[in-house]
Amino acid sequence: MAPLGPTGPLPQSFLLKCLEQMRKVQADGTALQETLCATHQLCHPEELVLLGHALGIPQPPLSSCSSQALQLMGCLRQLHSGLFLYQGLLQALAGISPELAPTLDTLQLDTTDFAINIWQQMEDLGMAPAVPPTQGTMPAFTSAFQRRAGGVLVASNLQSFLELAYRALRHFAKP
């Protein structure tokens, strides 16, 4: 698919807001991971990867944001869809534990705000799809351990997602 729409730099105000929102989401995700590590000794996401596959924890694609195929419209759509997916995953973690509920709620709200910001920018550029993305099937965490392990994996995957998003948005900031 050929790149469509504007390919010039994104507004500085949008990029600064994205950077601020990314930092918030990363801090929230780190807080969730640190609490799960300290409280439940779930400290190494790499040890939980197989469980993540078994639970069906999806990871959003960011192929349009990679340096090989970077395109503004596709990347913004994938960023929005990815954040929307993480909203659903975070909702699926509800009930993880009483002490983590406030952190999870904050992470969910900050992720939602970031997704809304991306959507508004797509609308401003005339690039918003006619139909917003759908969430798809979310994993069913059937035990407290699965929710906690899922929390570690979702937070870890979200951090990786945000790192790639950050690099892509910085590229679009260049004149």
UniProtKB/Swiss-Prot annotation:
Q: Which GO terms describe its cellular component?
A: extracellular space
**Record's SUPFAM superfamilies?**
4-helical cytokines
Q: Which cysteines are joined by disulfide bonds?
A: 37-43, 65-75
Tell me which residues are glycosylated.
134
| Gene Ontology molecular function: any one | cytokine activity
**Which PROSITE patterns does the UniProt entry name for this protein?**
INTERLEUKIN_6
Q: Which GO terms describe its biological process?
A: immune response; positive regulation of cell population proliferation; positive regulation of myeloid cell differentiation
Secretion signal span: none
The record's Gene3D superfamilies line, in alphabetical order, gives:
1.20.1250.10
Where in or outside the cell it occurs: the entry states: Secreted
Keywords from the UniProt entry: Cytokine, Disulfide bond, Glycoprotein, Growth factor, Secreted
| Function summary | Granulocyte/macrophage colony-stimulating factors are cytokines that act in hematopoiesis by controlling the production, differentiation, and function of 2 related white cell populations of the blood, the granulocytes and the monocytes-macrophages. This CSF induces granulocytes.
* Family (UniProt): Belongs to the IL-6 superfamily.
Name of the protein: Granulocyte colony-stimulating factor
Species annotation? Canis lupus familiaris
